[in-house]
Structure formats: C-alpha cells, structure tokens
C-alpha cells in the first residue's frame, strides 16, 4: 500500500482526479467529510442511543447525565484528530514527498481520522450489540426465516449476523432522496472508517472477535470494491476469498475509541 492512494480525495461520482494541492486551505477536503457527517440525519439520531447510563452519585445532583452515542462519537473524534495529527507528522518525515510534491500536511491525517471516528458508531442499531443480536435472531430462528429462499447465502448471512459496521458503510454511501452516493465522503475517509473490510461469508472458525465481523452488505459490495481498488488495499493473506487488510489509519480510529 502507498500513501498517495490511501489519502485519496476522490468521491463517488467524480469524473476527474482531485489533487491535494488544488484544495482550499481554509477548508480541507477531508474536513468537508467531517462537516457532512455531523450535519447528517443518521449522525443526529445517535443522540437517542445510549452509550453509558452512569450510576448516580447523588440522585438529586444536576450533574447526572446519560452518555449518548452522539456524545461518545464527538469525544472519540477529538481524540482521533490528535492521534492523526501526531502520526501524520511522523509519516511526513518518513515520506516528505507527500508534502513537497502532493501538498499533504499533518492536518490531513487528523481530519481523516476525526471524520472516520465521528462516524464509527453511526450504523449501530438501538441497544447496540444487543440490537444486532436481536435482528440476527429474528432471521436465524424467527419469522425472518421466510425470506431466506429469496436471497443468496451471503445476503441472508448479512442479516443473520447483522453488523453495525456494515450498516454504517451503507448509511454513509447509500443513494437516496435523489442524492447519488449518500454523503459522498472521500475514499480516504471511507477507508479509515472500514474496520472490517470483508463480507459476512466465508465465515472463519475462530474465537477472535474480528473474524466474526464484516464491513459491508452484499447490496453495497460493488462500491466497497471500488473504494478498495482506489485506495490500493491489499488482500488479507488470512482471508484470501473475501477480505482485505485495513487502511492504516483505521487503527487510530480504533485506538481513539478505546
């Protein structure tokens, strides 16, 4: 993988290449991603999803509050921006041509990580992982089984193992209301967002949590592969059939979430 590809400013529907040197320095291309996410309906809906309900120290205290997914996402994005800028400085020192030839600065790295971190929970259903399991059970051994015959094995597996990360990719990229490509985020930001760049099948027999998760639904596979190709993500040697190695900045998004 190379950073020129990994930092792609391309957006769905683009007909010409976006160059970093041509970007407006007062509002970086990757900062536009952050703005589009924070003003989106799916992000605003996170205010109704609980991240943590703290035990009250004092029942009558005005300082008691519910920590929502929206608040959590804002906090993670702030940490992610700092991590991205710090790591970005080191990357530019090792690869100075990214700045001298292409015009990238350490702020670009911070902006990518901040935007991806802001969206990291955007696809989570109500009740988080419990909600994912409830949806999965509905299709695995509930009334949802009636739809199995109308789907491919992979399509049905997407529902049996319903995954918030895949749903997030769908929300960010799905064409609706006449808007092609959803939020039309840069491919660099989408790459950093994709924690699990693989499909729901084949399933790898493993106890490792990452092997049980996936990053896209079958309905979004063609665009997922377009992003992968643009970024130059490499096939995962441990899952050659349907998986790719992560975008390096994804690790910073995950670190910010810990």
Residue ranges of model-derived segments:
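Sequence-structural signature of the catalytic-core scaffold of metal-dependent phosphohydrolases
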Residues: 1-26, 34, 38-49, 74, ...
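A short small-residue
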Residues: 50-64
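Active-site oxyanion-binding pockets that recognize sulfate/phosphate
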Residues: 63-66, 246
């Amino acid at each position: 993988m190379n950073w020129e590809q990994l930092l792609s400013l391309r957006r769905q529907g683009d007909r010409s290449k976006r160059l970093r040197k041509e970007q407006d320095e007062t509002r970086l291309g990757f900062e536009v991603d952050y703005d589009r996410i924070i003003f989106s309906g799916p992000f605003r809906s996170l205010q109704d999803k609980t991240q943590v309900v703290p035990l009250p120290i004092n029942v009558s205290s005005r300082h008691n509050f519910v920590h929502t997914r929206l608040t959590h996402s804002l906090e993670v994005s702030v940490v992610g921006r700092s991590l991205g800028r710090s790591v970005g400085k080191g990357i530019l020192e090792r690869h100075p041509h990214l700045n001298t030839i292409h015009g990238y600065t350490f702020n670009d790295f911070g902006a990518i990580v901040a935007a991806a971190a802001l969206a990291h929970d955007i696809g989570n259903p109500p009740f988080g992982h419990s909600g994912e399991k409830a949806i999965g059970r509905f299709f695995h051994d509930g009334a949802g089984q009636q739809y199995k015959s109308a789907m491919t094995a992979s399509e049905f597996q997407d529902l049996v193992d319903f995954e918030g990360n895949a749903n997030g990719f769908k929300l960010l990229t799905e064409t609706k209301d006449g808007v092609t490509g959803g939020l039309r985020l840069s491919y660099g930001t989408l790459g950093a967002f994709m924690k699990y760049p693989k499909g729901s099948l084949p399933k790898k027999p493993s106890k490792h949590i990452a092997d049980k998760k996936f990053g896209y639904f079958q309905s979004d596979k063609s665009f997922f592969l377009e992003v992968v190709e643009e970024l130059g993500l490499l096939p995962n040697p441990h899952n050659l059939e349907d998986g790719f190695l992560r975008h390096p900045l994804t690790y910073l998004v995950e670190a910010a979430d810990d």
